[in-house]
Regions:
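Mixed-charge, Lys/Arg-enriched low-complexity segments
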Residues: 46-88
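DE-rich, low-complexity intrinsically disordered acidic tracts
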Residues: 17, 37-45, 72-76
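A sequence-composition feature that detects small, non-aromatic residues
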Residues: 19-20, 25, 31, 41, ...
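Acidic, low-complexity, intrinsically disordered interaction modules
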Residues: 28-56
């Protein structure tokens, strides 16, 4: 298993990618949490498909900064992991 989804200590939820490039990011659905994003910080929005909600990733903490990694593919996989989590 390369994903861990759990509560964030400050509230809300976080996702952790346990394989390189390793990272932890907070995430939410619905409206973009602009008040939670630092100016100049990396964030990602997955628009969803059909009835799926938009997923926003923010407050990234990189253990292994992504070097030569397809960020879109990594974020698509992150969104899929969250969809699986939500569907239970």
């Amino acid at each position: 298993m390369s994903w861990c989804i759990e509560d964030h200590p400050d509230g809300g939820l976080q996702i952790t990618h346990l394989a390189a490039p390793r990272f932890t990011a907070r995430w939410t659905t619905g409206a973009f949490p602009i008040d939670q994003v630092r100016e100049g910080a990396f964030f990602w929005t997955d628009e969803g498909h059909g009835l799926d909600d938009t997923i926003h990733f923010y407050a990234f903490e990189w253990t292994d900064p992504p070097d030569n990694v397809d960020i879109k593919r990594l974020m698509d996989r992150s969104a899929y992991a969250i969809e699986v989590y939500v569907m239970g």
